[in-house]
Amino acid sequence: MKVVTVRTVVVAGAVCLGASAAAAQVVKQEVPGIRNFAKVESTVACAGAITADAVPAVKKMGYAAIINLRLATETGADIEGHTAAAKAAGIQYIHIPFSAANPDPAAVDVFLKAITTPGVAPAFIH
């Protein structure tokens, strides 16, 4: 249990430090169908919930992959619709369910592996 806790704390700390360092580089944009779009750097953008209709716009912006951290049980998550839209648009779609209320260290490991896989960057994370 201690290893899991330490790993989670280290990852959370790294994310916070990275976010702080990158804060000056964050570019926010208004994109139809995408809430709170923020380009963190040339290889990563983050946003709130998106609609399946917004997936082609993500591809058009040059992203190679969409990493969806929403739980399938969330209102409006529409994992199947997003998967189909990504396939139609020719963009990779990676669904890693993550609960902020009950974080799973295994999901963190899956995310870290996904984000470092060649061909995934630039990645759009929501």
Language-model regions: role of each:
Residues 1-10:
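Bacterial N-terminal signal peptides that target proteins for export
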Residues 7, 18-123:
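Cys-dependent protein tyrosine phosphatase-like superfamily
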Residues 11-15:
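Hydrophobic helical h-region of N-terminal Sec-dependent signal peptides
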